[in-house]
Amino acid sequence: PAVRQGVWNGRPVNAGLVIHEGQLSFTEEGLSCLVDLGQWWKASRGLPLPLGVNGIRRSLGPKIHKEVAGLIRQSIVYGLEHREEALDYAASFARGLDGERLSKFVAMYVNKWTVRFPEEAKQAVEELLRGAYQLGLLERPLVPEFVGESGR
């Protein structure tokens, strides 16, 4: 909203970060893309841009970790196999997306990478955390632990 209005906290802005549904509609708002961060990250790092992960408390232990990872995977697979039902559910959170855009948006974030987190995606998360530490955004280095069938 701030970029659309040209003001944030009472100060003029002429650039911003477009996320979520805005990726599909920003041009209709009269905005233009200066840099696609996904393309920039891929070109500069040779890895996909990590968009999000699920976390679980370490103290729950490996058995619960694997069980929860399995349940999440089953849920995602169910949604992929029952796409129309999943899209109907997602529509209640869609913030103004029509059916075609909703389908495209969901496909951007729920896909084969969501089911099986490949090594390349793990490396991307590690690179993001490493870069955040090097820039002083993290107080200490963070090394993620991956859980589930595709965990290390």
Predicted feature locations:
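Long, low-complexity C-terminal extensions of enzymes
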Residues: K122-V125, L129-R152
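Pocket-lining segment of extracytoplasmic ligand-binding domains
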Residues: A2-S92
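Secondary-structure end/capping motifs
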Residues: G61-G131
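Solvent-exposed, flexible loop/coil residues
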Residues: G38-W41, R45, I64, F117-A121, ...
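Generic structural motif recognizing short loop/turn segments at the entrances and edges of beta-strands
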Residues: R11, E29-L31, N111, R140-V143
